[in-house]
Amino acid sequence: MRISLKKSGMLKLGLSLVAMTVAASVQAKTLVYCSEGSPEGFNPQLFTSGTTYDASSVPLYNRLVEFKIGTTEVIPGLAEKWEVSEDGKTYTFHLRKGVKWHDNKEFKPTRELNADDVVFSFDRQKNAQNPYHKVSGGSYEYFEGMGLPELISEVKKVDDNTVQFVLTRPEAPFLADLAMDFASILSKEYADAMMKAGTPEKLDLNPIGTGPFQLQQYQKDSRIRYKAFDGYWGTKPQIDTLVFSITPDASVRYAKLQKNECQVMPYPNPADIARMKQDKSINLMEMPGLNVGYLSYNVQKKPLDDVKVRQALTYAVNKDAIIKAVYQGAGVSAKNLIPPTMWGYNDDVQDYTYDPEKAKALLKEAGLEKGFSIDLWAMPVQRPYNPNARRMAEMIQADWAKVGVQAKIVTYEWGEYLKRAKDGEHQTVMMGWTGDNGDPDNFFATLFSCAASEQGSNYSKWCYKPFEDLIQPARATDDHNKRVELYKQAQVVMHDQAPALIIAHSTVFEPVRKEVKGYVVDPLGKHHFENVSIE
């Protein structure tokens, strides 16, 4: 068969195009992260779990300021510079120009980031009259739990590229607070378009941000697919596609990692650590955790309103046995809420010893020598601060039984667990925390302040004035030595009042395949992939 020169040329061109397409597909870089669960949603303003932040605020959004990856150092983000007034109450941010928004099938942006987006992102959380305030449940645990509605007097637009925050008082950690996930900046133009279309909740479900990756597809409990954002204002990611393979079981995550079905996994089973250290295909990274695992006592439920009962339950638990069985060498017993690596730590506090007889005596003083029944909520997922909540719950249940307290273990799907706990349905509930900004305020105020007991993450529902009178002045002064002293006193008060059983600080392990380069373990518990490459 003869082929004309014209047809021959077309054939060669076609083959060339095919070859180019194949080459491009071969060169495309995909990284698969075996995540531990499904996100609660894609708007980090509305949620508090690290699982949700990994899937939303980290890849999709930016903040005015950011934490340098792997540190708690605050660096420029969407704001390229800022000034703080002499009285510490006015912060002026100058926005980076040329920052582009993602798009999706429902919305194509017509402008770049400007001050309207910043004002909207904070006004939605602060202002009950904002049309978006109640959309998607309207729960802003961080913003409200940290007392920001009272702290922030006004967020105002100076011009298209300048925004000013006016505070009611100085706030030492305020700049670091703005690098946290709840302070992610959303598009006002997108919000307005979805409100006009009668589908405002799409702002939170189909995210549009300015981050290094944009969302392509989400299948609940299966996978999330992102692509590198070509218009990203920062350094473009070195991978083309990022996939979250949602894998709740740590053993299955490890099996996938070994088969190269994923390249990074979080929260390995402590029992697998020794094997991972011997695995030549894996780089086992580790870091002391800026975290704490604890069991909150709901002081609004009897008999936990009695401090003697809370102390008794604390004395009854053998924490050393828990550290050995649950953490298996990857954690240390905790006596304070903040970890010993954090400034302000009070090492003079004496921990509750394991003392069942003391526990029985305190229960007798409380009129409960015959014991009582109680619920014990166990997390359904692994977290960096608790690798096996079910096992921990069973051990606490057995210890309490020895002093006459009969505990019923309760659990729910993770999102439902958090929702019900926030509503205060529990008597005792396993929780934990990974620091968000390296400041003690992020532990004390976020987890145990009066404001957090109403709307935030204070699952003990503990509002105690002597404690409040220490942590509030500590956040209002920029005198570091004074802050240290106030936080040390706060730890004594918290120890004596026992609103929670403080259990452990864990070591964070991150198994990463050796083909992965540039991955950094983050002290704040996030998983960043924008600077990662694959060989």
Curated annotation (Swiss-Prot):
Pfam families: SBP_bac_5. Keywords: Chemotaxis, Disulfide bond, Peptide transport, Periplasm, Protein transport, Signal, Transport. Disulfide bonds join 34-262, 450-463. One of its GO terms (cellular component) is ATP-binding cassette (ABC) transporter complex, substrate-binding subunit-containing. Glycyl-L-leucine binds at residues 48-50, 383-385, 433-436. It is found in: Periplasm. Residues 1-28 form the signal peptide. GO terms for biological process: chaperone-mediated protein folding; dipeptide transport; heme transmembrane transport; heme transport; positive chemotaxis; protein transport. Induction: Expression is repressed by the presence of casamino acids. The keyword Nucleotide-binding does not apply. Its main location: periplasm. GO terms for molecular function: dipeptide transmembrane transporter activity; heme binding; peptide binding; peptide transmembrane transporter activity. The complex is composed of two ATP-binding proteins (DppD and DppF), two transmembrane proteins (DppB and DppC) and a solute-binding protein (DppA). PANTHER family: D,D-DIPEPTIDE-BINDING PERIPLASMIC PROTEIN DDPA-RELATED (PTHR30290:SF38), PERIPLASMIC BINDING COMPONENT OF ABC TRANSPORTER (PTHR30290). Consists of two distinct domains (I and II) connected by two strands that presumably function as a hinge. Undergoes conformational change upon substrate binding. This is Dipeptide-binding protein. It comes from Escherichia coli (strain K12). The gene is dppA.
